[in-house]
């Protein structure tokens, strides 16, 4: 009877151990796939912007819609996307970093673009355009209401100086705030003129 009980206990221990190992493996594999998916998305932004910067054009612009969420092994992972600029030996660096919305201090993945162009990042605070300083984050949250699920990039070349501008906007099924009359692009353009710069021409 004692041997039978011990065998059952050993079997239970084995089952629990196997369950723990499988759960640990699944969790870690899921995290690896998630990080890879997020990094791939961020690198897509960096590569596209790099192509915009090195192209022989004097003005270019493009909206970037970001995913509403990422999915890892059937689980929805909601996140925030952080854009910031930092100094770099080449000139400037535009940094993209995605954080799990449940754990904002946890960076899922990051990517960056180093360029000799000047980088300027703007936010909209209380309806007013604000230019962010170095390492200040522009935070996009596709789950916010109203959504901040896109950013817009504009490349300008004035007097030989190339500048890459980035600012937030929203794209929904029925509307967008990125460009056009009354758009955030128009507001940033007006901000530049008011501060001695030139309006966007593209």
Question: Where are the regions a protein language model picked out?
Answer:
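N-terminal single-pass transmembrane signal-anchor helix
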Residues: 1-30
């Amino acid at each position: 009877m004692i041997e039978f009980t011990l065998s059952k206990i050993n079997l239970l221990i084995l089952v629990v151990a196997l369950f723990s190992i499988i759960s640990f493996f699944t969790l870690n594999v899921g995290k690896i796939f998630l990080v890879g998916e997020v990094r791939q998305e961020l690198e897509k932004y960096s590569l596209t912007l790099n192509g915009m910067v090195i192209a022989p054009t004097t003005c270019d612009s493009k909206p970037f819609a970001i995913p509403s969420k990422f999915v890892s092994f059937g689980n929805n992972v909601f996140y925030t996307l952080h854009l910031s600029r930092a100094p770099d030996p080449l000139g400037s660096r535009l940094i993209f970093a995605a954080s799990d919305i449940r754990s904002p201090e946890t960076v899922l993945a990051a990517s960056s673009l180093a360029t000799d162009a000047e980088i300027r990042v703007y936010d909209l605070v209380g309806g007013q355009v604000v230019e962010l300083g170095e390492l200040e984050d522009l935070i996009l949250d596709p789950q916010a209401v109203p959504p901040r699920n896109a950013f817009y990039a504009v490349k300008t070349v004035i007097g030989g100086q190339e500048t890459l501008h980035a600012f937030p906007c929203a794209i929904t099924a029925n509307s967008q705030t990125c460009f056009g009359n009354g758009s955030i692009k128009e507001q940033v353009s007006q901000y530049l003129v008011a501060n001695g710069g030139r309006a966007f021409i593209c």
